[in-house]
Amino acid sequence: MMISDLPHDLESEILSRVPAKSLAKWKTTCKRWYALFRDPSFVKKNFDKAGGREMIVLMNSRVYSNSVNLQGINNRFDPSMEVTGKLIKLNDSKGVDISAIFHCDGLILCTTTESTGLVVWNPCTGEIRCIKPRIFYRCNDRYALGYGNSKSSCHSYKILRSCCYYVDQNLSLMAAEFEIYDFSTDSWRDLGDITRDMIVYSSGVSLKGNTYWVSGSKEKGFFMRYFDFSKEVFGRLPLPYQSFNANHTAALSAVGNEKIAVLQQKILAMSDEMRIWVTNKIDEAKDLSWSNFLLTVDYGKFNLPCLVNVTSFLLDEENKVAVCSDVDTKDGLRSRIYIVGKDFYKEVFKDTRGSDNNWPLLLCYVPSLVSIQENIPNKAEENEIKGG
C-alpha cells in the first residue's frame, strides 16, 4: 500500500511527523499535498511536533547556519561547530547588509543596515516578504515579530516597531513611537505613545507569539518587559535579580517552546562571573518563577586573555552548558563562539576578520512551513505541481 492510498486523516497524521524541510521539497508532488502543506492547522501541527532545532548566527552583516555537536560533552568528548553555509540569498543577489535578525515561529525578520526596509523570510520554504515603512524608518528603531491569538488555527502575524528618543539637548525629555504592521491587511497602524518606559538592555526573544526584553531604571530596578501581540499592550515580569546597576549586562534566550533563560554579567565591574537562570513554563494564568542558579561560570579559572562580554547565548539544560557569542577585544574585534559550563570552556569558532560594528547574534531556529505570502501558487510552482 502506498501512502496515497491511505485515508486522508491518517495520511495527514503521518506527514505531520516528517521534518518541515523534507515536506518543503515534496510540496509539488501533487495538488493534494500542496494544499495540505499550506493548510494552517497542518502547519501548526507539524511545527509543534518538530524535534530538530538549528542554530543561526548574524556576523558581519550576514546570516549563517551553524551546526554544533554537544554529544558526549559530559564524557569529556570535545564539542565541535561547523559553519554550514550562508543563508540569506539576498546578500548575494542584491548586496543587502543585515543589521539585526529576529526569529518567531520559523520566520526570520531582517533589518537592513541602512534602515531602508524590513524583510521577513522563511528559510524552509524560501518565501520572502518585503515590508515598506508607513512613513520612514529611524536608525534606532527596534523591531519584533510575533502573533496574536486567532479563533482560527492560523496565527495572525504582526511586527512591532518601537522607537524611543530624546527631543531636547539636555536629554531630559523623551518621546516614543509605536507602530504595528499586520500581515493580514498589509498595513501599519499607529499605537500612539503607549509607554515611555522602553529602555531595554537586551535583544528581544519570542515565546508563544509574545516578545520579551530586559528593561530597567534606577527607580524600578531590572525587570523583564514583554509585548502581548494579542492585546497589543506592554507588561512587566520579575527577574531573579531586582537591583539596578549600570555595571550589569544581560541577555535573554528562549529555551524550547515554554521557557526563557536570562544571563547576567557584571562586566563593567571587571567581574569574571556569569550566571544563568531559567523560568518555569511561562503561562499567563500562573505567576512567573525562576530556578536557582542553573549555571554559574567563573571565567577566571580558564585564564582567558580578556574579559568575556556575552552578546547572545543558547542554553542546553540537559548538559548544563551554554553556547555563547561575543567579540574578542584582544584580537582585532573578531567574533567568536564558544561552549562553556561550570568547569568547561571550548572555543569552537572565530571569525577571520573583525569590525567595530560586529556584534554576533545567535538564534535557535525551528524550520516551519508557515506561509507569509498570499495563498496563491506562483507560476513556477503551478508548472511543477503534479496531478492528484
Curated annotation (Swiss-Prot):
UniProt keyword terms in alphabetical order: Kelch repeat, Repeat
Kelch repeat residue numbers: 163-208, 336-383
Pfam families registered for this protein in UniProt: F-box, FBA_1
Domain F-box intervals: 1-50
InterPro entries per the UniProt record, alphabetical: F-box-assoc_dom_typ1 (IPR006527), F-box-assoc_interact_dom (IPR017451), F-box-like_dom_sf (IPR036047), F-box_dom (IPR001810), Gal_Oxase/kelch_b-propeller (IPR011043), SCF_F-box_component (IPR050796)
Record protein name field: F-box/kelch-repeat protein At3g17530
Origin species: Arabidopsis thaliana
Lineage: Eukaryota, Viridiplantae, Streptophyta, Embryophyta, Tracheophyta
